[in-house]
Amino acid sequence: MSRGLSSPARWSLWLVSLALLCAAAATRLHLHTVVDTDILAMLPPQQESAAVGAAIEQSRQAFVDEVLILVSGDDETVARRAAVAAADVAATAGLEPDDSGRSMDRLLAVYQKHRYALLDDAAAARLAQGGAPALATDVATSLASPAGMVDAFGSDPGGHLSHFLTDLPQPYPGFLPDGAFFSAQKDGKYWFLIRDRVSAAAFAEGGAQGTRAVTEARAAVAKVCVRCDFAATGAPLFADAARHAAQTESIWLSLASSLLIMVLIAYVFRSFAPHVLAGAQLLASVLAATAAVILVFGSIQVITLVFGTTLIGIAIDYAFLYFAEYWFGDGAPEQVMAAVRPGLYMGLATGVVAFAFLLLAGFPALTQFAVFSVAGLVEAGLMVVLIFPVSLREFPQVPLHPAVLWPQRFIQAACRRSRWRLVLPLAALLLCIPGWLMLHPSDDVRGLQNLPPQMLATDAHIRETLGQVPPPGFFLSQAPDLQQALRQEEVLFDRVAAGAPGYTSLGLSRFLPSDARQQASLAAWRQVFADRQALRAAFVHFGLPKELADRSLAEWQAADHASLTADEVSAAAPDLKTFSISAGAGATLLSTVTGRSDVDSATLAGYAAATPGMSFVDPLGRIAATFQRLRERATWLVILGYLLISALLVWRYGRREALRMLYPPLLALGLTLGVLGWLGEPLNIFVVVALILILGLGRDYAVFLREGGATRRSPALAVTLSALTMLFSFGLLAVSSIPALHVFGIATLVGILASYLSAPLSLPPTERA
């Protein structure tokens, strides 16, 4: 149908179709969210309660915003001045200081007011059972120790309030609240911890803000104290370092691959036209693919741009097929389209079918990949059909040269009947068997990150100094009301303390005992102070003055006997609100357990399972499980897609030839997996995407050669140029320092080489001349 269209009609049809697609996408466009950088949004929605979702987001936000600055020195006064300078500069740079230290001072006043409601279960039971003699015993024991002689509040002779305060969880063991800091004296040095949060809304902006603030704070400390040590860590700092490394790497990799491809095209075709047409095809394909995704989803994920553009790399095969036939084929320019049409249409059909199957994945990531790739491939094919014939009309004036001839010679030599056509692939597959056995899946997102070793060492040093390792997850206590939720959390913490005394529990119940526990505490004190004479006698029995008994009784009578409430605690320490999750009816509390070393998730999950109303959530584990399902589903969909492609090939070429054409891409797939296993590389979703690319290229090579035959040089040249450009584009990623791109690059490097070298196996063997 397109053969009879005039040149203006072809240009109009192509431009109008592209413009209509872009205009339709513009109606769905949100200017502030054109490119979405939240990778987690690419994961499918979890089948979870609103409380779990809110808790995951709240804990994630607390982690990604925190910046820790640690200043230390031999002289306390100078080190403190340096820490003050660092805190001031960080605040000026936009970081928000943490208020935990000052919150503790306000909490102390609240606890003093409600001190009679703060006994733990064991102390309350002992006083309730022992009465006045039990209190006298506590007072005598307390006063017998040097620390007990110091009555900080003038109303705690038995040390019961002091015991409660001492038992409060310390975020950083050995570090105590000290105004705006947490401070400690250890290893002959004075340490000051500054806790800040980035204030920028966007994650990337927060990383830049945190890095800038830390740099300025480091300089401020150096001015005040040359001999003081400075260290900082936090997710924003790691994110900014990773972003800078990725930007630098992407620039030089892009420049290197672009330069190599331009030199290759210029050397082979000796013309500027291929650069213009191939570049226009790529731009139009990316534009159409992006518009299609925005039209369907309203925005496009940055990871879709990266990997979708990678998959559209297959589309340049269509351009090379046309260029090779036009410049070095046997027919006139007007006959080029007729010569390449069968291979072009068959390659386009099989490619669209393969990627369209990903639409059935049910995963936002794969669905976007599919829409992007299908739209891009269709646009690339449309441009070849409509624009290339009217842009390349004159006979090319480029003579044949060795770079044009050797691909055909290689294909012809590889197609000659020989036992090596059977022996070499079998030998390669036998060598791959140990590699297949060594393959191991890895869906942990931490293994995909490029974290600078120096920053990791600094982070480990800070965590070791603070005696705190970030928890692997968190607990949720869900109940109809707050009091039941607090009680469930108390039961869990008691179980953890009994089974793992080295762990530190951190939750609202550690700062706000449940009302049941508080009422038991108040009842115990009522029992103690029920009989004035018995109280006096008990004190005198231990050699204590009866006036001390009278004072204790008077303080009890004058004290507030009401329970401590959540509102009072939250007003004194607003940070404690992070332990409460607002999601629907009832009450939900978030809590964690930390230790000086890594805490085992399975152990914590076991404690939660043994406590009614409690659950343990491992966010990283959930993400890893989602990536695993994503990888497995993508693999099965690719298999189903290839079964359908097999049917198309059987319909076009017959069963025998279809099997012959499927052999090279499947052989390349097996070789790629074998090499990955030998190298110890993990099998993850990025490897699956690379395998999709490899299968697509291998399929195109087989179709192009089958339609062109071994006796024509243009199909062989097109396949060779495609392989070389793919190696330049994606094989270079093998040297990337980013693990995800590194394994993707290795897979594509091996797979493309294997696809090209095995492509002649798609043709029937020929007899030697």
Task: Identify the residue ranges that each predicted region occupies.
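Extracytoplasmic
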Residues: 103-267, 271-272, 508-650
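Solvent-exposed, non-transmembrane loop/terminal regulatory segments of multi-pass membrane proteins
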Residues: 27-74, 172-181, 321, 419-422, ...
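Signature of alpha-helical transmembrane segments and their immediate interfacial
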Residues: 1-37, 389-445, 760
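Juxtamembrane segments of multi-pass membrane proteins
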Residues: 420-541
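Pore- and gate-forming transmembrane helices of large, multi-pass membrane proteins
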Residues: 329-361, 708-737
